[in-house]
Amino acid sequence: MAAKRTPTLDRIDVKILAALQRDGRSTIQKLADKVGLSPRACLERVRRLEASGIIAGYQALVELAKLSQPVNVFAEIVLEKQASQGRFEQRLAAIAEVVECWEVSGTIDYIARFVCADLATYEALTSKLIDDPNLGVARIVSHVALRPVRRFTGYPEALLARKLV
């Protein structure tokens, strides 16, 4: 089986990625003007970036606080044994309130971000995780977020440019 090749990018590809991170609704014409290409050439590059999986999709950033008073909780999760890791990850992926989860190194196994309607909902979800013996959750340490200081809005352009041709 052939090794999967990492797509190579040039400076124009990086400009396209940076521009789309800032404004994913930009028209091809506006994008082409920003990066100095014809609309057709720009569209071909965008399609290539999409086909390669570098552009994985497009989303709207929803300001949830304008709709409700959600509770953001960051949970440090430790498993009793790594054998239950697959079951645990599947269960977490099925919980709509888990909007992000990372496996990490160190004294904990995962950091998960829960966005819930209230603390009672969060408590019920984590109790189910802890009480399920098939998941092997040893403990969950919760950190309730008070306010966002900085939110993710895209990767730094310098990181996008790491694999230039």
Q: Where is each model-derived feature located?
A:
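A compositional/biophysical signature of low hydrophobicity enriched in polar/charged and small residues
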Residues: M1-V165
